């Protein structure tokens, strides 16, 4: 059974499963509220695979965030929501931009995090990731919503022909985001992200693909080296998006959460 709830500051959340809490921080989505339709179905399928003996609270961004927001701002929102809801530190997980926020929460507010799982992320963006996210951000800021998401394709695909075909397909997207200001806020925050990893006290699992163009291998390895208690799982041949399809992805997370 999935429960909808609202955390401190109006932060939307969905709760999956029963047991001790794990907070999952969502990546950049077009709406500030909980996902609906296919996005919700995808989230449900993914998180249900991790609900063994725990409740996963999937949380979105706080409504009202604007351009110029920093990663520290987003991390403070999450930490405050955690401590007001649970009155104690909890397990925290994030993917992509959500993973960047999770790293920042663990660095800034060690009192809010017991264990950390950060997937498809690093302490900062690589050059390709920074460029494509700036392009995406600028399109949103200009109100050029049609096909705006195609700006991210060079971060997903490295070969020219597949990149060209996917760009053409994504350019057909005619949807209008419900909360473009919030998307811009998250993109601004990650653009300036530079996590002080040495301050992360929680045991940390980093998962990444060795072909991730947003957060390339060297940055991921630097992140793992700088976190005092980090375990790195680097999946060969996986990129930013398809890292979740690796057969080891969910088992590695479950083992880390259960055994550490």
Question: Which residues does each PLM region occupy?
Answer:
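Flexible "cap/lid" loop of the alpha/beta hydrolase fold
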Residues: 100-103, 107, 114-143
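Conserved acidic catalytic loop of the alpha/beta-hydrolase fold
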Residues: 73-90
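Catalytic histidine-centered segment of alpha/beta-hydrolase-like enzymes
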Residues: 238-251
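Short beta-strand/loop motif that positions the catalytic acidic residue
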Residues: 200, 206-208, 212
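Conserved alpha/beta-hydrolase catalytic His-Asp/Glu region
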Residues: 127-130, 146-191, 196
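Catalytic histidine neighborhood in serine/cysteine hydrolases
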Residues: 221-241
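Conserved alpha/beta-hydrolase "acid-adjacent" motif
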Residues: 213-219
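Conserved HGGG/HGGXW glycine-rich cap/lid loop of the alpha/beta-hydrolase fold
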Residues: 5-65
């Amino acid at each position: 059974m999935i429960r909808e709830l609202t955390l401190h500051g109006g932060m939307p959340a969905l709760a999956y499963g029963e047991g001790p809490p794990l907070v999952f921080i969502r990546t950049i989505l077009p709406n500030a509220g909980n996902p609906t339709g296919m996005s919700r179905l995808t989230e449900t399928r993914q998180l249900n695979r991790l609900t063994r003996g725990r409740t996963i609270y999937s949380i979105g961004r706080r409504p009202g965030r604007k351009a110029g927001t920093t990663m520290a701002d987003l991390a403070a929102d999450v930490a405050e929501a955690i401590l007001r809801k649970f009155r104690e530190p909890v397990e925290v997980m994030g993917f992509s931009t959500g993973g960047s926020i999770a790293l920042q929460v663990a660095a800034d507010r060690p009192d809010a995090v017991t264990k950390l799982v950060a997937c498809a992320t690093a302490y900062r963006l690589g050059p390709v990731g920074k460029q494509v996210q700036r392009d995406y951000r600028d399109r949103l800021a200009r109100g050029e919503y049609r096909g705006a998401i195609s700006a991210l394709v060079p971060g997903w695909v490295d070969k020219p022909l597949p990149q060209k075909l996917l760009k053409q397909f994504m350019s057909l997207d005619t949807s209008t985001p419900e909360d473009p200001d919030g998307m811009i806020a998250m993109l601004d925050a990650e653009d300036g992200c530079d996590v002080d990893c040495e301050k992360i006290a929680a045991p940390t699992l980093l998962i990444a693909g060795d072909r991730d163009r947003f957060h390339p291998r060297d940055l991921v390895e630097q992140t793992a080296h700088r976190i005092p208690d980090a375990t790195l799982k680097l999946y060969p041949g996986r990129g930013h998006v398809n890292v979740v399809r690796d057969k080891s992805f969910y088992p590695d997370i479950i083992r880390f959460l259960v055994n550490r």
